[in-house]
Amino acid sequence: MTTETIAKVRPIVTGQRDRIFTDLKEITSFNSVQGVPELVEEHAHAAAWVKAAFESVGLTVTTYQEDTPAPLFIASKPAKGDAPTVLLYCHYDVVLAGDPSKWDSDPFTLTERNGRWYARGAADCKGNVVMHLAALRAVNELGGTDLGIKVLIEGSEEQGGAELSELIKARPELFAADIILIADTGNAAVGEPTLTTSLRGGAQITVQVDTLQNPVHSGSFGGAAPDATAALIRLIDSFRDEHGRVQIDGVDVDQKWSGAQYDPETFRKDAGVLDGVEIMGTSA
């Protein structure tokens, strides 16, 4: 983005401040926890709000997994000519707010304090839903774009995203794009806008260890009889050395991080590491 473009965009976005606050106030008013029977209607209201909101910025919204408790949406416009397509991601479900008495304000009433806005989901991830809407309104005000746009809005991210996983397997063509921007990460520090260019991957692996034909009594066989649970513990423990450094054959651990640095003391404070406890992987 050029300096000239930023100069054009900034006043448009700033001029939307009241609209952005209103949008965020509305969507955070829904206690849209997925998978809680007594909150099904709240989740459904949030889903309906999302669909209407993205239609209001000129995108065609298609609902998927309608027969599940957590429908997801793809709001889109086609690319013009050979223009690339951008896939944007966010989600409208939240986690439980916990004990309301521990909040400084009602978790479902957006509240401004010291220049920051507070409510359940204001950051993760309803603020990012509203951010996409504000950006799309700004694009429209600037005359539109030739880019193809797809916005994926998920309804069960906090519960593992089973509905999205199923759709990706069944309809991979829906997610075809030249670039993907996931609006569900964080900043390097408060007030420091951050672009995350890669994310940690994950894999779910089932490992089964068998050592005995049948369970036996520990009073008679304990000690000498090989314990499958103990074997699994030793297996997992072998992944790291005594300082927490990864030691798995084939995994390159010599790379140096070139992005924003995370001061160790700040990390300790943010993570709540107790005094006297080492940060994993840092000792020589």
Set out the residue ranges of the language-model regions.
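N-terminal helical capping/dimerization or prosegment-like subdomains
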Residues: 2-100
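Conserved active-site and cofactor/substrate-binding residues in soluble primary-metabolism enzymes
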Residues: 15, 19, 41, 45, ...
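Generic secondary-structure signature for well-ordered alpha-helical cores
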Residues: 18, 29, 55, 141-144, ...
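Short, internal active-site loops enriched in acidic
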Residues: 69, 155-159, 253-256
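Active-site metal-coordination/substrate-binding segment of hydrolases
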Residues: 83-150
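Active-site-proximal alpha-helical scaffold in enzymes
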Residues: 126-143, 161-169, 226-238
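Histidine/acidic-residue-rich, glycine-tolerant segments that coordinate divalent metal ions
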Residues: 146-227
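Acidic-enriched catalytic cores of C-N bond-cleaving enzymes acting on peptides and small amides
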Residues: 218-284
